Amino acid sequence: PSVQNLTGEDMTKHDALPTRDLQKYVLKHPGIWIIAISSAFIYITKYAITGWGVLFLQKEKGFPIEEATQIIGFYAAAGIVGTVMAGWLSDKVFRSDRVKPTVLAGMLSFITLALFLFTDSGYMMNVVYVSVFSLAIGVLYCIVAGLMAIDIVPRKATGAALGVVGISSYVAAGLQDITSGYLIQFNTTRVDGVDVYDFGPVCWFWLAAALISFILPVLNWKKMRR
């Protein structure tokens, strides 16, 4: 039986389409591509901290490798909490309103990322910054890449929609590594035999991605649902 039969939901005209036609429908849906782009930017910031956070804490903030690794360890743990919270926050607290939790999580991730990147703070404050950022980005990803994507396509097309979003996310994660590595290497100079890092350009790249990741779906949500 279909999901609609099990739940008592009404069938839409798209639900009756063959699978191949539904896949074409998803690929032609501009809303899915907006979500895919937004999700890609989420992955840029998410994997930037995972991949480059230890180096950043060592070279920019002067932490020993042991403490830098511990701080990023808190980042990984907090992301699990954010993922668990996302559905409850959107459906129970905000009553299935996708925009408000997206703005909340997006702003929180943007602010805490900026504080992490641009403030000279100690061990505990950096733990707080990366933990809150990771929690917020976990919520943001689940709402944008999951709930929003599911909301705008027929039930039978959710697999195709999530596939498009997932592929774009992982492609962006790979491109992020290449771009971030280039920006870090290009802005590193050698002084008296010691590498001096300038993380400014790559930090602005990460922060811009964090802003676009939630602004894009929020501004286009009404259009995507039509």
Give residue spans per PLM region.
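Juxtamembrane intracellular "pre-TM" segments in multi-pass secondary transporters
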Residues: 1-35, 60
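Extracytoplasmic gate region of multi-pass secondary transporters
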Residues: 29-86, 141, 146, 175-180
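Cytoplasmic membrane-interface "Motif A"-like loop-to-helix N-cap segments
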Residues: 91-106
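Paired intracellular helix-loop junctions of major facilitator superfamily
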Residues: 95, 148-158
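A membrane-interface helix-boundary motif in multi-pass transporters
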Residues: 97-100, 180-210
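C-terminal ends and interior cores of transmembrane alpha-helices
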Residues: 107-121
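Multi-pass alpha-helical transporter architecture, strongest
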Residues: 116-118, 204-226
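A late C-terminal transmembrane helix in Major Facilitator Superfamily
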Residues: 155-188
